[in-house]
Amino acid sequence: HIGVQDCLNLLRFAVLPEADLTLAEILRGPFLGLVDDDRYLYPLAGERDKGVSLWTRIQDSKDPDIEAAAEFLRGLLERTHLAPYEFLSSVMDQVGADGQTGWEKINARLGTPARDPVEALMSRALQHDSVDPASLQGFLAAMEAHDTEIKRDLAAPEREVRVMTVHGAKGLQAPVVVLPDTTAGPRGGS
């Protein structure tokens, strides 16, 4: 799930801040929300000397939005001593400059269905902390080694519109189902 990937990217950054792709995904993700590539990402990533990391460019930026992002990222680096569950919990409960917690940012960007997989990730982190030595790098390695897929029960009724493929909706029931004809050409007068 994309919310889980966003949380794992925060852990990856804390372990290796020089990983430019991970950092770019965090910038565009729900925690920072800098989705305008032309304004944020291209000037930071494209206009840099060879060998200069994206993290270095972010720290040197004078753009107020990038400075706020740098502050959030520095906060992640200050938490590297925490166990994985404590790290994730502190990020999700932290109130940002915009007045929203990490949970609220995930919900606003990805919707309420994103909460279950993120909670499952945090449960995995708590289990990992009790069995293995609590380290961010160890938890990341365990998650990547097991490649576990966290799914949500979609059969539970909710008051929301779900856009799904026919295969994904197989076996589900709803009072209204819309099946658009995506293969026919435009009809005259419509």
Stretch-by-stretch model annotation:
Residues 1, 5-190:
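Conserved helicase C-terminal RecA-like lobe
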